[in-house]
Amino acid sequence: MLSKEGGFSEEQRARLSHFVTNLDSPIFALKNLPEVVKGALFSKYSRSTLGLRALLLKEFLDGEGGNFLDDDQQDCELGIQKAADFYRRVLDNFGDDSVGELGGAHLALEQVSMLAAKILEDARIGGSPLEKSSRYVYFDQKVNGEYLYYRDPILMTSAFKDVFLDTCDFLFNTYSDLIPQVRSHFEKLYPKDPEVSQSAYTVSLRAKVLDCLRGLLPAATLTNLGFFGNGRFWQNLLHRLQDNSLVEVRNIGEQSLTELMKIIPSFVSRAESHHYHHQAMVDYRRALKEQLKSFAHRYGEEREISKEAGVKLVYGDPDGLYKIAAAYMFPYSEHTYAELLDICRNIPNEDLMRILESGASFRENRRHKSPRGLECAEFAFDITADFGAYRDLQRHRILTQERQLLTTKLGYTMPSQLIDTPMEAPFREAMEKADQAYRLIAEEFPEEAQYVVPLAYNIRWLFHINARGLQWLCELRSQPQGHESYRKIAIDMAREVIQFHPAYELFLKFVDYSETDLGRLQQESRKKS
């Protein structure tokens, strides 16, 4: 309890000092508490008249659950299980899903296929992924004489086992064999400038080589991921993983649940197989998937399938500029948004342009974000590009992306630097071998066949984004240090939107349309200077 003076007693201050960063300021942070305890604490905080420090004393240190701490445990490793058992009831009593956002966990996922990595990274809100880079790390290593790629148990017990293994090994062998050849080719093509440090040149050259060759890696290639996510994120992701058609993904879901139950059990317990929420979610997702799949097959059978690669603007908001201008003025006006829209539709065009220019004219670099009003205009694109580029762009969050199955039916992207060189033929040979293997396997196992498809093969996806998100993406992904595949996509999206209406060029002023050689050289040189 609080002392009679309304503050904390010396003993209370001593106890609290282990768990808060200060005892007097109205702004402070929590420390040395398990995620489940912090989450439960905040869940009660929103419905209490007490301050958080007083609530921590009353409910967690002096109250019913006070014995969850052993006297000799006053650092990060506390009695997590004791706290979880007691405060699971607290969380369940409040019942709000948002309570699941008050605690989180870091999870390492190693030896995951690049195909599964994309399924993991489909989860958008509440989680932050980081993946092993294909431009800084070589993927030519072997362990016990085997290249590091996922061997799907269904394929490994099927008639396609040898085809799958032979094709993946061939792809990795080609990747490994071409590394020194491409490096030597680029050293001649882009000799080191005497004013550039050797280390900066080496890093840039390596990125160029690996960017060029990553398309040979099959989707089965093993990678490592690190995730931080809040409890609600993990619960939703686990439901999706456990219902996936791929064995690997379901196994990842089961193993992730096991580990997260050790850290944030109260936040992910609904994903346990025996929980009544779990089966209802699984049944819902399966029924929905089957229904939508049947519609797609029924209504798409008679129409010819486009195989054209590139970026195509499918939809642009015809009232987008009016919406942006009205939203720009809204916070500083007393009119309704509807009234401001009407005003913007009826003012002279030069006045409308002045309003739009005001949201862009003060920007000095791409990190100067435009006002949120820019989010009121939306665009939808059809994109058909290599899976490697998709892997990069899929990480963007504030938008809608939906992809189709990875196949070899849409062709592949040939690295421009290898065309008309001795390296072109082995690259194309590897692509053709992968195509043959995919088509053979896909007749019986269309989803598992994705594992044998190299990153150079094209995938089609829907890309729906607002103008502010497009601004950020195009200006970031068009920078010279980026991979040529996603640079082209970013530049093409910007051009498509500007062609839709030239006024949008105002908001895309830092898109870099230049052609580059060693794209990362300037950035690496800045690091060394």
Curated annotation (Swiss-Prot):
Annotated ThyX domain residues: 38-274, 309-511
Pfam name, any one: Thy1
Keyword match Thylakoid: no
GO molecular function: flavin adenine dinucleotide binding; NADPH binding; thymidylate synthase (FAD) activity; thymidylate synthase activity
InterPro entries: Thymidylate_synthase_ThyX (IPR003669), Thymidylate_synthase_ThyX_sf (IPR036098)
Protein family (similarity comment): Belongs to the UPF0159 family.
A GO BP entry: dTMP biosynthetic process
Keyword terms: Repeat
Protein name as annotated: UPF0159 protein CT_632
Keyword Metal-binding: no
